[in-house]
Amino acid sequence: MSCLPVLLLLQLLVSPGLQAPMTQTTSLKTSWVNCSNMIDEIITHLKQPPLPLLDFNNLNGEDQDILMENNLRRPNLEAFNKAVKSLQNASAIESILKNLPPCLPMATAAPTRHPIRIKDGDWNEFRRKLKFYLKTLENEQAQQMTLSLEIS
């Protein structure tokens, strides 16, 4: 007995023509879930020792503005990627940060100011600013997801 008919059937089953097409909404949902999972994983790592000082959640207004500015998303991520290299025991966060660029929105204009500054080796500052940055990014993605679902 030949296995040729079985191979032909298998090829038909896995060929792209017979699979359900990916819609923009499906693709957006999948990418949003992946980004959300990466953000959650980083935040979990940020909650591990060394523990932050009491002023963990305090960010000045200028830092908040810089971290929320859409046109600074990529430069800010680059600043976090640079700063994470100066921290001990941060390799897990570093590897996730490297995968985060597809989650960032496209800049609509050139940045008008410098990205966030993070002191080398300062876990507390790094943690405080990165957590705010990630929460802002996550909120923005949730809003985009809601808008795309309303449109479709």
Swiss-Prot record:
Its main location: secreted. Activated T-cells, mast cells, natural killer cells. InterPro entries: 4_helix_cytokine-like_core, IL-3. The keyword Transcription regulation does not apply. Keywords: Cytokine, Disulfide bond, Glycoprotein, Growth factor, Secreted, Signal. SUPFAM superfamilies: 4-helical cytokines (SSF47266). Glycans are attached at N34, N89. Disulfide bonds join C35-C103. The keyword Cell division does not apply. GO terms for molecular function: cytokine activity; growth factor activity; interleukin-3 receptor binding. One of its GO terms (cellular component) is extracellular space. Residues 1-19 form the signal peptide. One of its GO terms (biological process) is immune response. Pfam families: IL3. It is found in: Secreted. Granulocyte/macrophage colony-stimulating factors are cytokines that act in hematopoiesis by controlling the production, differentiation, and function of 2 related white cell populations of the blood, the granulocytes and the monocytes-macrophages. This CSF induces granulocytes, macrophages, mast cells, stem cells, erythroid cells, eosinophils and megakaryocytes. Monomer. Belongs to the IL-3 family. This is Interleukin-3. It comes from Hylobates lar (Lar gibbon).
